[in-house]
Regions:
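Glycine-/charge-enriched secondary-structure boundary and capping motifs
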Residues: 41-42, 47-178
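Phosphate/diphosphate-binding glycine-rich loops and adjacent basic-rich segments that engage nucleotide
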Residues: 1-47
Length: 178
């Protein structure tokens, strides 16, 4: 019944975020523009991306979370799942919420990957707008009761993923980044 997950998410649920491996093939129109407009070289390293070439950082393979998430579903009361793809947090998280529900995402509760800091700097994209374009280091979110959050995170970490509580579902609308 997870397909109708939006009907299960409740005010008070938390969102556990699973770290992304990078851009995950979304937002590449902007990426190409940033690279082109700034004369960036895919074969060069930049301080923002910590010793990797820009090409390596941009082409980091997309994480696939199926096995890990199935383990969480088997052991926790999952109310909703959202893959953070094109449209970032703003378009993807609301898909699992009912009307009248929103989230306040706690920036700093996960690592924003260096490649996003580079794109923000050179692309002169507003920080808040970055969350509307990119995954910003979160590839997927799982909505579940707060009492299941620690267990879900432990399962994900046992599978080699980085995960953390990003937000709580609140009364309201949309996604707020705090």
């Amino acid at each position: 019944k997870l397909i109708d997950a939006g009907e299960r998410v409740k005010v008070g649920d938390v969102l556990v975020g699973i770290a992304s491996s990078g851009v995950h093939s979304n937002g590449f129109s902007l990426v190409r523009k940033v690279v082109s407009d700034n004369g960036l070289k895919l074969s060069e390293t930049y301080p923002e991306i910590e010793g990797r070439t820009l090409g390596e950082a941009l082409l980091e393979p997309t994480r696939i979370y199926v096995k890990q998430v199935l383990k969480v579903i088997a052991e926790c009361d999952v109310h909703g799942i959202s893959h953070i793809t094109g449209g970032g947090f703003d378009e993807n998280i609301p898909r699992i919420l009912k009307d009248g529900q929103g989230v306040e995402v706690k920036e700093g509760s996960w690592e924003i990957l260096p490649v996003f800091r580079l794109l923000e700097k050179y692309g002169k994209v507003g920080h808040r707008e970055m969350f509307n374009i990119f995954n910003m280091g979160i590839g997927m979110v799982i909505a579940l009761p707060e009492e299941d959050a620690a267990k879900a995170i432990a399962i994900l970490e046992e599978c080699g993923e980085r995960a953390s509580v990003l937000s709580r579902v609140i009364e309201g609308e949309g996604v707020t980044i705090k």
